[in-house]
Structures are given as C-alpha cells and as structure tokens.
Design a protein with these regions (language model features):
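Phosphate/NTP-binding elements of NTP-utilizing enzymes
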Residues: 1-213
C-alpha cells in the first residue's frame, strides 16, 4: 500500500494529467490522414477546401490549426503553414449563433460557462484575459487575445488576436481590417480564400493570405 506522501503524489500526478487533457487539448490533437493532408497543403497553397460529411472532423481540424497559429505551438513534425510571430485571425460563419456554437466552442470551450474557458483548442493558460463579448448573441465572443510563443517554445513573444465574425453582419464588417489568417464554416465544407475574397456567399473556410513564414 502506498504511504500518505506517495498517495498524495499519485493524486497530484493524476490531477495534472486530467488538467492537461482538459485544458491543453491542442497537445493531444492527432489528425487522421485526410486531416493531415489538408493541413500540410497550407505550406504550398493559399486556398484550401475540405469537403466531407457531417461530424467527421472538418471544424475540429480547422480549430486545431487555427489554435496552432494563434499560440505558436506546432507539433515537432509539422510541415504545414507556420508563423513565427503573433497573428491576427478571423473565425467566421453564417450567423453569430452558428459561430458561437461551432467555431467559438471548438476554440475556446463551452459558451456561457466560465469554468469551461480553455477547454477548446486554445489552451487555458494561453488566454491573456477573458474574451470580450459580442453584441446580439448571448455568450458569444467578439475578440480573444492569445499569448504567442517564440520559436524557442518557452518565452512569449507577443499577443495574437482572434476576432469572431458572421456573414449576417454584412460585407462592411469584413472590409478595412487586415488579418493574417481567416477561417469560416458553412454547410459541409472548409475552404480557404485569399484576402480579396467575397465572404458573404462562400462555403466554409480556414484561410491564410500571403505572409512570410
């Protein structure tokens, strides 16, 4: 039988493992072959489109890659698109509610539950502060600030900014502001489009306009 100190150490270790799986999902992301092919293509193509059936991991894949770019945390064998500096990103969808229930949930955690912040693909300790709320949709986020790790993987070299947008806001909401990485969901597709794309009628997308690696 373990002694008191040994038992305490075991409990501490198990709690740490549980917290890692709960609040650091990105570190446990292991893509399937097709998901990996889609992400690898980012190293060579400005536009990417992923079409598949419902509930097979399209949005999950997009959220994982977006979290990598926001945080600077890439797998050691990563060969897709990569930024060595903080980025400005968009995550968009057909409506504010859809964006909240899909993109926001996968990236940040269950909407409307404070204790669930950090249970999405963005690690809990990567949030600079609690995200600001959007207008018109309960528990929907507008802007998220994320700590970006330097290439050494240890120090923070800046803050990435993620903004949630919806097509129902109109074209004007997508004009003027610059972004490094753009993503959107629509129907059963994921698609990446260049900076000048028309967003109001596009199918789903995670997009990376031209930018130095």
């Amino acid at each position: 039988m373990p002694t008191g100190p040994e038992l305490a150490k075991l409990i501490e270790t198990l709690q740490f493992a549980k917290d890692q799986k709960t609040f650091h999902k990105l570190r446990f992301f292991r893509p399937y072959m097709k998901q990996q092919e889609f992400m690898n293509a980012g190293a060579h193509f400005r536009e990417r489109l992923l079409i598949a059936a419902n509930q097979v991991g399209k949005s999950y894949t997009g959220a994982a890659e977006t979290a990598m770019h926001l945080t600077g945390e890439y797998p050691v064998d990563w060969i897709g698109r990569q930024w060595t500096r903080p980025i400005k990103a968009w995550a968009a969808g057909e409506s504010g509610q859809v964006v909240r229930d899909v993109s926001q949930k996968l990236l940040c955690g269950e909407p409307g539950v404070d204790t669930m912040l950090g249970t999405g693909m963005i690690p809990k300790d990567a949030f600079v502060e609690r995200p600001s709320l959007a207008r018109g949709v309960t528990a929907a986020y507008d802007t998220v600030q994320v700590k970006h790790l330097a290439p050494d993987g240890r120090s923070v070299d800046g803050i990435s900014v993620l903004r949630f947008k919806s097509y129902e806001q109109g074209r004007a909401k997508f004009q003027g502001e610059t972004s490094t990485w753009r993503g959107a969901t629509r129907s059963r597709r994921w698609m990446s489009t260049p900076k000048s794309s028309r967003v109001s009628r596009r199918p789903a997308a995670w997009c990376s306009p031209p930018s130095p690696r």
